[in-house]
From Swiss-Prot:
EC number: 4.2.3.5
Full protein name: Chorismate synthase
Gene3D superfamilies registered for this protein in UniProt: Chorismate synthase AroC
Positions of FMN binding: R126, S127, S128, G285, K300, P301, T302, S303, S304, R327
Gene coding for it: aroC
Cofactor: FMNH2
Amino acid sequence: MPGNSFGKIFRITTFGESHGPAVGVVVDGVPAGLRLSQEDLEFELSFRRPGRLYVSGRREKDVPEILSGVYNGRTTGSPIAIVVKNTDVISSFYEEVKVKPRPGHADLPFIMRYGYENWDYRGGGRSSARETVGRVAAGAIAKKLLMFHDTWIAGRLKSLGPVDSPPADFLQILCSKYSPVRASDPETEAKFQELVKQATVEGDSYGGVAEIVVKNPPAGLGEPVFDKIKADLAKAILSIPAVTGFEYGLGFQASRMKGSEANDSIVRKGERLGWRENKSGGILGGITTGEDIVVRCSFKPTSSIRKPQGTVDLRTGEPAEISVLGRHDPAVAIRGVSVAESMVALTLVDHSLRSGVIPPVKLEERQAEVIEDRWRRYMEECRPTAESQS
């Protein structure tokens, strides 16, 4: 099964299945000298961890173990292997799935591709969102390394089902980590919570849209024509389980506008040139402009639901119904925000290393100190959130 790696210089390879012994990631291309601890990884993993209100009831502690690539609290430049054990697995929930593939899920395509006898049906196996633990762990390293340029990444759940959020500034989006449903304001949070409760009672689920904003990104990232930053961001985001769409800046809204409406005036901003409204979402010509990068992605409703759905019994070939048991997110988009943040970070740090914005081989001591100071400031901004979700 190829296709488990992402990136060129900062390259990750995730491994593991939903109900296997563990999941994890190998991260290659991290410069030597970056200060890195288990706490750094746990901090980011806490925001996607299940077992909390409004998300999956699967109670995983998600404690990362760094196996290689770090010595005396600093990266050595060699591959960093991280493993997270699966500790709350109940495979008996999936006995019916073994003979009745779930509508909307990857069950039947995996059978078609790899053969029924090779299919790990337990919790979705490799197609499960449990795989994203490795992405978020690697994303923590990427986010920290981006502090070299004082680049911050934050995300929120912009919409859930029929409920949309009002516009929000970066601080509001950053503080959405306080929200159990990743909402950026109290009124929207209450509406999101009501929808999730409703879906849970009905045995159903909702889709949503995540919005990710990158503050102070380096200008000049992206390599036309086939390695445009927008193309790599799209690939990164669309690789996330349950994601069905991607846009940046005005996105699909631009298709309904005139050029005079969609174009953004170039203006002087202090000692540099910039754009008045950042309608392009920080990307033009496939290259970052230095303005905030704004991307959005849509998540479909969670496929595994209790409400009966039509399928086929693989034993008989006859029509059948399935009501999926187990512990599933009523809205996978809630925890998907953290995964989307991580994929944006992984894309940007890879391009930063490729372009030389970040030293690709080693960090000087002063550079490592500055990164650490900025990272601690970021963690303190979000600290109440991490504690409230533990």
